[in-house]
């Protein structure tokens, strides 16, 4: 059975388009082929049938029972050099279910909310580094906040030598992967040859070894000096047990920590940078948001930010208009199925295109416009709005990411007055494994009197 139509260019050329110009590539495919088309991304991603209609996504994401569709970890693609083979993203079947069951508790309820003061403290300290009115890169600032939150809330590190070493090494490694050309070895496995520390792959391997050494040292220290009172995610994972009473191995812990880092650092920083841009690009949005934030009491509980409708709408619209992840996790067809009039056979690989779903004018009128009110006027199904993916492969850190985004924004906006520094038009662009706004700069000063959050 023939697959749906798609670009006729070679898989290498399509992969280069995907790496360098993913947005225009997807839009061009959609204009020519409609809501379903096939792309060929070579050795790292293979052949994918992409769907951008909510009805198709409902079928795909609601049938993850391995009867109609399966989501094998082998489809983790270019992420394996970063996250390893034992993380929740790289596992399948019963192993994947076990990993999710062990990982979910730290990201829900009071455990997650206990991180509010930590997030606020990190945000305050980072923002104060550029006072008064020192221009700063918005995205770099948000990356710093995101990385420090992960090191403290996930890794459980306090400031010290190991913290400083990991911050420097992780920051440098992740920044190097933000260049699509430098990150080429992730997309083309044949480029993974060690020609020394001055070449991209060799440099990556050396930094990864240093990072792994520090992570394994931290795991060993925690095992040797167990402290039940600790609430960081590494401590909770160390004490977690599956249904058989088995704990996570050191390798599993390392891979899960790196997965949480890769999944949570770049995505959260990008979403925060975009939010700051739109809020300050559109004064009406900023003023309305500040008015709502003033209603927060100084002693409000940690979940109060989720009860602010306009803040929630601004965050949702930010994640809609420029989703960090362009596709859902791929699924493999297990049984013959008709999807939107397309016949799919076992072995075909399908994915939902989040970017195109979020740009559908029949779902989101005037989709190019930043309009938080759309999320106040109607409810969107999980197949129309899915910035964190869906089904059994939905991002496990979704609740934490949403909580962090709202807490950071409320802390910045109530504590500081920010303004955009005029420059080139801000556009969305590819950054290796993710997407991000093009560089833009801001300046900040203390908001007086300071509003407590």
Residue ranges and their predicted role:
Residues 30-31, 123, 171-172, 294-296, ...:
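Cytochrome P450 proximal C-terminal region
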Residues 1-4, 68-79, 95, 111-270, ...:
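Cytochrome P450 heme-thiolate monooxygenase catalytic core
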Residues 226-231, 290-308, 321-342, 351, ...:
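Cytochrome P450 fold signature focused on the C-terminal beta-domain
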Residues 267-286, 290-292, 399-414:
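Cytochrome P450 catalytic-core helices
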Residues 1-84, 89-98, 113, 117-125, ...:
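N-terminal membrane-proximal hinge/A-helix region immediately C-terminal to the signal-anchor transmembrane segment
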Residues 84, 258, 263, 302-306, ...:
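Cytochrome P450 heme-thiolate "Cys pocket" and heme-binding signature region
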Residues 352-378:
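Conserved cytochrome P450 K-helix/beta-meander segment immediately N-terminal to the heme-binding cysteine loop
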Residues 15-37, 213, 217, 300-340, ...:
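Conserved cytochrome P450 K-helix E-x-x-R motif and the immediately C-terminal K′/meander segment
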């Amino acid at each position: 059975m023939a697959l749906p139509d798609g670009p006729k260019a070679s898989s290498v050329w399509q992969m280069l388009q995907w790496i360098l110009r993913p947005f225009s590539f997807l839009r061009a495919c959609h204009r020519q082929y409609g809501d379903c088309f096939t792309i060929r991304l070579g050795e790292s991603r293979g052949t994918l049938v992409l769907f951008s209609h909510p009805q198709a996504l409902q079928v795909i994401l609601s049938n993850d029972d391995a009867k109609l569709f399966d989501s094998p970890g082998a489809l983790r693609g270019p992420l394996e050099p970063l996250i390893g083979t034992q993380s929740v993203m790289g596992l399948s079947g019963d192993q994947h279910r076990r990993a999710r069951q062990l990982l979910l508790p730290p990201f829900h309820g009071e455990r997650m909310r206990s991180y509010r003061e930590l997030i606020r403290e990190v945000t305050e300290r980072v923002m104060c580094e550029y006072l008064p009115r020192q221009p700063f890169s918005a995205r770099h600032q948000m990356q710093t906040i995101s990385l420090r939150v992960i090191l403290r809330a996930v890794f459980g590190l306090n400031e010290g030598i190991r913290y400083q070493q990991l911050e420097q090494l992780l920051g440098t490694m992740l920044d190097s992967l933000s260049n699509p050309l430098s990150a080429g070895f992730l997309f083309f496995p044949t480029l993974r040859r060690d020609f020394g520390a001055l070449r991209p792959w060799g440099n990556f391997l050396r930094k990864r070894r240093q990072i792994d050494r520090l992570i394994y040292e931290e795991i060993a220290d925690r095992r040797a000096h167990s402290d039940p009172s600790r609430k960081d995610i590494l401590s909770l994972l160390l004490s977690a047990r599956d249904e058989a009473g088995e704990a996570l191995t050191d390798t599993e812990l390392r891979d899960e920590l790196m997965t949480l880092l890769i999944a949570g650092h770049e995505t959260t920083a990008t979403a925060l940078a975009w939010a700051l841009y739109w809020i300050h690009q559109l004064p009406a949005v900023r003023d309305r948001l500040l008015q709502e934030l003033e209603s927060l009491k100084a002693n409000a509980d940690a979940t109060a930010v989720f009860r602010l409708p306009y803040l929630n709408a601004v965050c949702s619209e930010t994640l809609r208009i420029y989703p960090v992840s362009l596709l859902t996790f791929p699924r493999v067809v297990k049984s013959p199925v008709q999807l939107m009039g397309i016949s799919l056979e076992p072995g075909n690989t399908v994915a939902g295109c989040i970017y195109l779903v979020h740009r559908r004018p029949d779902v989101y009128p005037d989709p190019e416009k930043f309009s938080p009110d759309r999320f106040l006027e109607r409810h969107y199904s999980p197949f129309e709005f899915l910035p964190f993916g869906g089904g059994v492969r939905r991002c496990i850190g979704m609740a934490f990411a949403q909580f962090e985004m709202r807490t950071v924004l409320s802390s910045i906006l109530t504590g500081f007055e920010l303004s955009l520094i005029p420059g080139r038009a801000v556009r969305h662009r590819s950054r290796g494994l993710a997407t991000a706004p093009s560089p833009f700069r801001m300046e900040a000063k203390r908001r007086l009197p300071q509003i407590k959050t």
